[in-house]
């Protein structure tokens, strides 16, 4: 039996890539799409909804969300309230929101996934960085994205820093008496690590984790050149959350 999928934010680039992935997978069935700014009532013979409230009681299994940070939390909670297992690629959630959604998913007996990055290579980068941080506590992150991305730093960079902080010796990176001649020149501070965000046209999603030690350096890098790189992870997420009973944060928990 096919997994019935709703895609919120289907008009965006990630939403369009997700729609094409679902439409070409015989195990998935795209039953509805959501976008508040769409003027048509159908898209490729699929019903279009402008208001998520109209989807209450709709028959579907999974809610895929590629919207905006401003509405992602409300959308995810709405999905859980209505029996849809959420697969969320929108970033910008606070740790408190994630904890609340995890608890609510358990109460609803529904699986779910919030993933800062759906590219398998990016997930591996985070795992490699976590291993390296045990031995190289001096580390900085540079994340680079297209200039339409609304949040900084990226969810992937934050997740990478969180994972490294769990195993890394907590030290302040840089000189103890350093001075920023221009505010923000050293980037954002996360547990003593620095995170730098680059936003330029022509980029998609890229991240470097740079480690330094006496006389040596180690650089880990992942590049997504096309949004199709995320679709393997989205497909995996859709097929896994219907088997689960709790929302997880990070694709690595489903691998």
UniProtKB/Swiss-Prot annotation:
It is found in: Cytoplasm. PROSITE patterns: DAPB. Its EC number is 1.17.1.8. One of its GO terms (cellular component) is cytosol. It is an enzyme of class 1 (oxidoreductase). (S)-2,3,4,5-tetrahydrodipicolinate binds at residues 146, 155-156. GO terms for biological process: diaminopimelate biosynthetic process; lysine biosynthetic process via diaminopimelate. Pathway: Amino-acid biosynthesis; L-lysine biosynthesis via DAP pathway; (S)-tetrahydrodipicolinate from L-aspartate: step 4/4. The active site is at residues 145, 149. NAD(+) binds at residues 9-14, 35, 89-91, 115-118. SUPFAM superfamilies: Glyceraldehyde-3-phosphate dehydrogenase-like, C-terminal domain (SSF55347), NAD(P)-binding Rossmann-fold domains (SSF51735). Pfam families: DapB_C (PF05173), DapB_N (PF01113). It catalyses: (S)-2,3,4,5-tetrahydrodipicolinate + NAD(+) + H2O = (2S,4S)-4-hydroxy-2,3,4,5-tetrahydrodipicolinate + NADH + H(+); (S)-2,3,4,5-tetrahydrodipicolinate + NADP(+) + H2O = (2S,4S)-4-hydroxy-2,3,4,5-tetrahydrodipicolinate + NADPH + H(+). It comes from the Bacteria. One of its GO terms (molecular function) is 4-hydroxy-tetrahydrodipicolinate reductase. Keywords: Amino-acid biosynthesis, Cytoplasm, Diaminopimelate biosynthesis, Lysine biosynthesis, NAD, NADP, Oxidoreductase. HAMAP family: DapB. Belongs to the DapB family. Catalyzes the conversion of 4-hydroxy-tetrahydrodipicolinate (HTPA) to tetrahydrodipicolinate. This is 4-hydroxy-tetrahydrodipicolinate reductase.
């Amino acid at each position: 039996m096919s997994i019935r999928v709703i895609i919120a934010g289907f008009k965006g680039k990630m939403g369009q890539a997700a729609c094409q992935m679902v439409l070409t997978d015989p195990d998935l069935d795209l039953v509805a799409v959501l976008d508040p700014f769409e003027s048509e009532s159908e898209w490729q013979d699929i019903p279009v909804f402008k208001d998520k409230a109209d989807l209450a009681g709709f028959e579907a299994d999974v809610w895929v969300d590629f919207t905006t940070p401003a509405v992602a939390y409300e959308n995810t909670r709405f999905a859980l309230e209505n029996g849809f297992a959420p697969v969320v690629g929108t970033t910008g959630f606070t740790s408190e929101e994630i904890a609340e959604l995890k608890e609510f998913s358990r109460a609803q007996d529904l699986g779910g996934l919030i993933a800062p990055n759906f590219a398998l290579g990016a997930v591996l980068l985070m795992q490699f960085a976590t291993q390296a941080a045990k031995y190289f506590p001096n580390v900085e992150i540079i994340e680079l994205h297209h200039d339409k991305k609304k949040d900084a730093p990226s969810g992937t960079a934050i997740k990478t820093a969180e994972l490294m902080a769990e195993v890394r010796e907590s030290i302040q990176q840089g000189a103890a008496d350093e001075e920023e001649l221009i505010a923000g020149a050293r980037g954002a501070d996360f547990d003593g690590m620095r995170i730098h965000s680059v936003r330029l046209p022509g980029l998609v999603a890229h991240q470097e984790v740079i480690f330094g030690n006496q006389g040596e350096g180690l650089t880990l890098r992942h590049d997504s050149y096309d949004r199709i790189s995320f679709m393997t992870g989205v497909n995996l997420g859709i097929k896994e959350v219907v088997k689960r009973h709790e929302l997880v944060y990070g694709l690595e928990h489903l691998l």
